[in-house]
């Protein structure tokens, strides 16, 4: 009887995050817990490196302690100070030979080869720039969670693209549309800025979003939960690490290998999960 109970306990533990779920996340590896407050992961297929935005302090503070680090696809830390002197860097995106980073009130432009900061684009009246995405035309969008807006960097000029949101965070440009995670909801803006709510009822701390199939997404919430969301509004809870005190912030994704990279924020690590 004891063996049977142990087996059942193990079975329940293994499946606790995938009950009634068609899609699952299985841990592959975790880095050492020495990354100073990792908020965002950018997967670079070109050089097969994970770029990690590290706050190393308070999320909205301009303290110069922030950095962009490098981690290998095996989970081994390469360089935690590839770019230093930032404040509280968060969402990232690559355009040509440049990496763009949301950093409190600036969009920072970095040379992708050298790691040299090339330029900073101040976003007027911004308070808490959070996520960043780039569309196929080279337009750069950044969310400001505290002022409830999304801004646009185009041709070197910054303008307000959309407002009247609750607390926008995660952004993803898909074709002519812009997907926005807004306090537990997933909203789609079409090319005419007409909003459509795709899904709602997720944890209020919605943070990162990646597309895994046309119309299907993995959505992370800072509090420690990850969902699989479809364009029909259905969603599955794939992961819940709240009890362990492990955050699931702005995720990265390797579409070829179907690996989701999760920055754990206060746990100071990045965890790789196989999506099935």
Description of each model-found segment:
Residues 71-75, 111-116, 153-157, 190-194, ...:
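Short loop/turn segments that connect beta-strands within beta-propeller blades
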Residues 26-32, 76-83, 116-122, 157-163, ...:
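A short beta-strand motif characteristic of beta-propeller blades
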Residues 35-47, 64-65, 83-98, 124-140, ...:
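Beta-rich, blade/repeat-based domains predominating
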Residues 25, 106-107, 112-137, 142-143:
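Asp-box/WD-like beta-propeller blade repeats and closely related beta-sheet repeat scaffolds
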Residues 250-276:
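Blade-level signature of beta-propeller repeat domains, shared across WD40, Kelch, NHL, RCC1
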């Amino acid at each position: 009887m004891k063996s049977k109970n142990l087996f059942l306990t193990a079975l329940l533990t293994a499946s606790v995050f995938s009950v009634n779920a068609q899609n699952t996340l299985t841990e592959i590896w975790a880095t050492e817990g020495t990354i100073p407050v990792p908020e965002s992961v950018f997967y670079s297929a070109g050089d097969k490196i994970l770029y990690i935005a590290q706050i190393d302090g308070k999320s909205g503070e301009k303290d110069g302690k922030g950095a962009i680090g490098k981690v290998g696809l095996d989970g081994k830390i390469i360089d935690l100070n590839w770019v230093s002197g930032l404040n509280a860097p968060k969402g990232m995106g690559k355009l040509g030979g440049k990496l763009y980073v949301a950093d409190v009130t600036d969009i920072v432009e970095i040379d992708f080869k050298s790691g040299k900061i090339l330029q900073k684009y101040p976003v007027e009246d911004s308070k808490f720039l959070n996520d960043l995405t780039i569309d196929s035309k080279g337009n750069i969008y950044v969310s400001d969670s505290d002022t409830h807006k999304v801004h646009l960097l185009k041709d070197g000029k910054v303008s307000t693209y959309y407002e009247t949101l609750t607390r926008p965070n995660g952004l993803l440009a898909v074709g002519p549309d812009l997907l926005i995670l807004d306090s537990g909801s997933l909203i789609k803006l079409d090319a005419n800025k007409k909003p459509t709510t795709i899904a709602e009822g997720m944890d209020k701390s919605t943070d990162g979003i990646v597309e895994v199939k046309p119309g299907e997404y993995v959505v992370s919430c800072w509090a420690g939960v990850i969902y699989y969301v479809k364009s029909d509004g259905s969603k599955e809870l794939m992961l819940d690490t709240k009890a362990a005190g492990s955050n699931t912030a702005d995720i990265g994704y390797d579409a070829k290998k179907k690996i989701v990279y999760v920055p754990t924020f206060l746990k100071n690590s990045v965890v790789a999960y196989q999506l099935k």
